[in-house]
Regions:
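Sec-dependent N-terminal signal peptides
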Residues: 2-13
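Beta-strand/loop nucleic-acid-binding surfaces
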Residues: 91-104
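Histidine-centered catalytic micro-motifs
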Residues: 148-154
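Alpha-helical and His/Cys-centered functional microenvironments
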Residues: 9, 18, 155
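Short coil/turn motifs at secondary-structure junctions
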Residues: 157-159
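Surface-exposed, glycine-biased beta-strand/turn segments
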Residues: 17-87, 97-99, 124-126, 131-132, ...
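Aromatic/His-enriched, Gly/Pro-containing loop or helix-boundary segments
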Residues: 102-132
Length: 222
């Protein structure tokens, strides 16, 4: 019963948190990448928002919080921004073109102090606070990005585990296409598992068949 109470409480906390987030843009949400997609060497840890094919779209803080981390690099997220929020989550904004002026000034100071363009900065809660809806950056195509978009994540601040951002925006995203299974790869654990008597991987493809109506044969009256 105790575990049930915890599960119910967690559900309501998630629901309340989801209701508190605003979308990072002021235009309709369209996705170019989903949470958990298989990439070259990892699973996609966030969602990718389309930015109407261009850079420089204002990005708003999804709720109150503070800038907890800033990364500037020619790889990965490129210009990346991390905002930590009172509800125990951290939101991540990647591939940014540039930062809001107050954030950009702080970065420039640190780059001169460290004598390096590439920086990975961690901030205290009182250094750069932000308000929900405040413009914190502008969308871009920096780092390991193949086109203008915003990479967006929601993480548990304490554990840094990634959460599915779709749960926070599902009321604003139109999805009319059902998932289609392309195949299933079964991988036996070495020395412990087999598939059809073999320890080799087995790829299963979906079986497709035409549907026919089952009923009375032609000419048979019922």
């Amino acid at each position: 019963m105790y575990k049930l109470y915890i599960a119910i409480l967690f559900f309501f906390i998630q629901t309340i948190s989801a209701q508190q987030l605003r979308q990072p843009f002021d235009f309709p949400i369209l996705l170019s990448g989903n949470f958990g997609e298989l990439r070259n060497n990892h699973f996609h840890s966030g969602i990718d928002f389309k930015t109407q094919g261009v850079e420089g779209k204002p990005i708003h803080a999804v709720q109150d919080g503070y800038v907890s981390r800033i990364s500037v690099s020619p790889w990965g997220y490129g210009n990346g921004l991390y905002l930590t929020h009172p509800d125990g989550t951290t939101t991540v904004y990647g591939h940014l073109q540039r930062f809001a002026p107050s954030i950009a000034r702080y970065i420039k100071t640190q780059q001169y102090e460290q004598e390096s363009f590439n920086v990975n900065l961690f901030l205290d809660p009182d250094q750069l606070p932000v308000k929900k809806g405040e413009i914190v950056a502008y969308s871009g195509n920096t780092g390991s990005s193949g086109g203008p978009h915003l990479h967006f994540e929601v993480r548990d601040t304490e554990s840094e585990e990634v959460l599915d951002p779709i749960e926070y925006f599902k009321e604003k995203i139109t999805d009319t296409r059902a998932p289609k299974i392309q195949g299933i790869l079964v991988c036996p654990q070495p020395g412990k598992g087999v598939v059809n008597g073999s320890s080799r991987k087995l790829e299963l493809k979906p079986v497709t068949a035409k549907m026919r109506q089952i009923g009375a044969s032609p000419g048979h009256e019922t």
